[in-house]
Amino acid sequence: MGESSALQSILYGRGALRLLDQRKLPLEEVYVDVKDSADGWNAIRDMVVRGAPAIAIAAALSLAVEVNDHNFIGTPAEAASFVSKKLEYLVSSRPTAVNLSDAATKLQNLVSTTAETAKDAKSIFQVFIEAAETMLVDDVADNKAIGLHGAEFLQRQLGSSKNISVLTHCNTGSLATAGYGTALGVIRALHSGGVLEKAFCTETRPFNQGSRLTAFELVHDKIPATLIADSAAAALMNNGQVQAVIVGADRIAANGDTANKIGTYNLSIAAKHHGVQFYVAAPVTSIDLSLPSGKQIVIEERSPKELLNSEGGLGKQVAASGISVWNPAFDVTPADLITAIITEKGVITKSDPDGTFDIKSFIECAK
């Protein structure tokens, strides 16, 4: 199941899950077998799989594999409790991405409701498995819708039907989702429509998701692309080489403040200064209406080794022993620096005259 292309981060068939080890890309394509939720937790925490949509799907499917042949002895209510506790455990693997916690909450509610009328524990597990599998299928369709909406909107906003060049950050493509991608999905749609001149991607230190993963996807799809250093982005904009920046999101607050890979905030400031449009592309599952603003978003901090050693912490030591390290995985871009938010339901624009996002009304109308 999943996106039917040669490049897939998630390979799933009922009872079996394999994840592409993205730490080894682009030099090796190695898949890791995931047999239960513990394997899923480790794969997410260790960044075998990454990207907000992908980790939510991988988490759900890891538990689906675990319960598929589980000889559970207990009542439906006990089975629902078992699933719920496993989901809570999986959410702890990476706390910033709302997709994971949102999916867990929905699945917990589903099994809890099912337990009220279920005759046995097996039926609880069956309902959970089917719901997890639906997440995988729906994600690809949602991403293609994001790509279509984004490509059409950019062409209208930029007043151009060809020769659009964009800059993206981190990895938001097939490797970060079940297939196609969010921000990279918009780039794919622009390319397939014949209007993309070039995609620029940042290296995205310290884990190098841009140089290792996004560049890999762009080359794989034969999309004209250029890799730049993170520190070259402002110079690129100053030279007039890009008309838009498109990034993904791990969590979007009710006011539009957006948590994304560290360095996104820098790009938004540079874009504002140079008059470059700045877009966020993400599914509505990345929106967290319970948070009034980005100030409430929990920012994950990762191992100092990612900065002290080469290859995002996987290689040799390059920094002086004894130096202290601050290594946040994400930052928050304020809504006032964001031009629009592209979703599978359409594009969220700012309302006049106050120039703010009314995300809650958009979601209610889109239901």
Curated annotation (Swiss-Prot):
Induction: By iron deficiency in roots.
Compartment(s) where it occurs, according to its Swiss-Prot or TrEMBL record: Cytoplasm; Nucleus
Principal location: cytoplasm
UniProt enzyme class: isomerase
Substrates-to-products reaction catalysed: 5-(methylsulfanyl)-alpha-D-ribose 1-phosphate = 5-(methylsulfanyl)-D-ribulose 1-phosphate
SS bond partners: none
GO biological process, one term: L-methionine salvage from methylthioadenosine
Listed pathway(s): Amino-acid biosynthesis; L-methionine biosynthesis via salvage pathway; L-methionine from S-methyl-5-thio-alpha-D-ribose 1-phosphate: step 1/6
EC number of this enzyme: 5.3.1.23
GO CC aspect terms: cytoplasm; nucleus
Feature type site, description Transition state stabilizer: 170
PANTHER family found in the cross-reference section: METHYLTHIORIBOSE-1-PHOSPHATE ISOMERASE (PTHR43475:SF1)
UniProt-recorded name of the protein: Methylthioribose-1-phosphate isomerase
Species per Swiss-Prot/TrEMBL record: Hordeum vulgare
Gene assigned in the entry: IDI2
